[in-house]
Amino acid sequence: MDLLKELESLVPELERGLGQASSLQELEEQRIAFLGRKGRLAQVMAHLPELAPAERPRVGQAANTVKQALTELFEQRKVVLEQAKEAAALSRFDPSLPGRMPWRGSLHPVTLVMEEICSVFGALGYDIVTGPEVENDYHNFEALNMPPEHPARDMQDTLYITESILMRTHTSPLQVRTMKSLRPPVAAIAPGKVYRRDSDITHTPMFHQIEGFMVDHNVSMAELRGTLTSFLRTVFGGDTRVRFRPSFFPFTEPSAEVDISCCICGGKGHVGNEPCRVCKTTGWVEILGCGMIDPEVFKSVGYDPEVYTGFAFGLGVERVAMLKYGIGDLRMFFENDVRFLSQFA
């Protein structure tokens, strides 16, 4: 067998075979047939030991040259077939079709409401203050006129870490911290998370609250009423009716709870012929608590209650969101149901 002639014949033979390969799979079959472990080149080289020792180097060098030529032919044909495949795919592409829109996220409804509330009070000249969620007993209770054993502490199911360290039950401690660091006039709101040991259809262990307060000379209940009425009508609409009811909070005196006309039934107490489940036919829903800052609180922060007066108020952000958007179950805010959350996109 003339091995040199056999080797030289492989190149034109492969060129004819590659011309018939119309897909990458057929091309791979040709590559295996010529360059595989049992391919044509390997079969020819299997006769190399039969040659005289002096001829083997010349045949081996020729085999390497042929192998390189075969490999180049395969690569060239592969490029051609890949380009043809890509062109075929592009020929089916219709640029006039609408594209696939990327998934769009949105802010959480609680975040939306909190930002709206902060925006309203920001326009009224209030600063935004923040502080620790892990609080001490003094700032959370004692400085707010709730000494140890005070019955008002029972109103809040507190999560204690140690005997004197706890998860804050309201954002009112920021009122104390801010007044300690600033001299009047002071006007600020304190948004943030608060924690209580409670969980049902209207309560969660963690929720969001905003505390607001103003301190200056001759601040009155009339200013409190005007501020909150303006705020509530901005958030819920200009036709919203607002009423103040006497109440009790240990850190304000006098104290009041604020109701607004029901957003669901429009203050009528019924929806069609059915009683309103939100306001329970009264036409009113409670929205926040407020009052004039107690003189004992002023004393704890070094303000002279004979010189300064001020008001404070607090509201739950989730409650505002529930009323604003007509949501019946507080827990829906925290269940991460995309079908629910995407409504606010």
Swiss-Prot record:
The gene is pheS. It is found in: Cytoplasm. Mg(2+) binds at residue 253. Tetramer of two alpha and two beta subunits. Belongs to the class-II aminoacyl-tRNA synthetase family. Phe-tRNA synthetase alpha subunit type 1 subfamily. This is Phenylalanine--tRNA ligase alpha subunit. It is an enzyme of class 6 (ligase). InterPro entries: aa-tRNA-synth_II (IPR006195), aa-tRNA-synth_II/BPL/LPL (IPR045864), Phe-tRNA-synth_IIc_asu (IPR004529), Phe-tRNA_ligase_II_N (IPR004188), Phe_tRNA_ligase_alpha1_bac (IPR022911), Phenylalanyl-tRNA_Synthase (IPR002319), tRNA-bd_arm (IPR010978). Keywords: Aminoacyl-tRNA synthetase, ATP-binding, Cytoplasm, Ligase, Magnesium, Metal-binding, Nucleotide-binding, Protein biosynthesis. It holds the Pfam family Phe_tRNA-synt_N. PROSITE patterns: AA_TRNA_LIGASE_II.
